[in-house]
Amino acid sequence: TIPREHALVLAGAGCGKTKTIVARAAFLISSGTPSHRIQILTFTRRSASEIVERVRMHLGDSAEGLKASTFHTWCISLIRRAPAAFGCKDYSVIDRDDQLQLFKVLRGKKASSQLPTAAQLCDLYSFARNTGLTLDATLKKNSPHSYSQKEQIAQVMLAYEARKRDRRYLDYDDILDVVAQQLSSSPNTRSWVASQYDYLLVDEMQDTNPLQWKLLDPLKHQVTLFCV
């Protein structure tokens, strides 16, 4: 029942963080906030569906229009509604399997056995993108035994970036990044996104990475954040 201002609720595992999100959404709607003006962000589709269902159990039809989604799904929906605004017109989204296939091809079958596998390369690439760390720092933290192969790994990742550009692909990390960049650099895009919401409710805030926070930070002056 706090007033309309940013809030961060700190709680340990098993303390009812999701229940708090449900209660907050129900309170806001009961207090007059239109349900479609609330966007809930969480980390799995299952939890997103569960939160909406639990709010509907409390409020019935008045919760119609409440939206809950993962960060990726939310960003994809924004891009699809305004692809030109995000510089993503005529791009295709690729999933993890597509990424693995590209890394397998670019790594090559005859590569040194010391070079990380396609799956490991994919994980290293994603970790660096989501944390903002350099390849050097990423390898030291996550794969020190592969550090001697840093130059080859860098070449594979540069080739992966080039292949995506050539084929007009967006992977899941690109989706977050392009939205975050536009929210930060384009007042028009930022205002367009912010105009759709009164509140952003973030579940499991402790699990957010720097890239996900870059999505929220530009909106903090126009949308009220409630993070648990």
Predicted regions and their residues:
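Conserved helicase NTPase motor core
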Residues: 1, 5-10, 20, 39, ...
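Alpha-helix C-capping/helix-to-loop hinge sites
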Residues: 10, 58, 62, 85, ...
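P-loop NTPase Walker
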Residues: 1-89, 167, 191, 223
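Coupling/switch/interface segments within P-loop NTPase motor domains and analogous charged loops
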Residues: 96-164
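Class I S-adenosyl-L-methionine
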Residues: 49-52, 56, 104, 161, ...
